[in-house]
């Protein structure tokens, strides 16, 4: 199993508070964040046990969902639903995104 999968689960757990704040103000945006963040874990989990192009496709979808999750948080901040995000959460978001980019692009 990839170590990054555990980090993704930590990110999802860290989103409980911000997600609740967002959902109080904008249920649609909250739902979108919930679906996108779950999609990261689900596609990463599926990709870990896939092969070839299917593996790459799952990791690519996970990367897109990770960017969508981050964008949901950025939009929520822009609308004033959230204050500053926790530095540790931001670091984990960036770490997951970077790892997924490397998984999709492969070794250089």
Model-derived segments and their meaning:
Residues 1-108:
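Amphipathic alpha-helical assembly/interaction segments
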């Amino acid at each position: 199993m990839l170590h990054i999968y555990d980090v993704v689960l930590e990110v999802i757990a860290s989103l409980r508070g911000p997600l609740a704040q967002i959902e109080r103000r904008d249920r649609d945006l909250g739902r979108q964040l919930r679906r996108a963040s779950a999609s990261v874990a689900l596609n990463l989990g599926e990709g870990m046990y896939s092969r070839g192009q299917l593996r790459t496709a799952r990791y690519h979808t996970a990367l897109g969902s990770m960017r969508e999750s981050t964008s949901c948080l950025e939009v929520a901040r822009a609308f004033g639903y959230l204050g500053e995000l926790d530095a540790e959460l931001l670091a984990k978001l960036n770490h997951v995104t970077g790892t997924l980019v490397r998984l999709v692009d492969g070794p250089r």
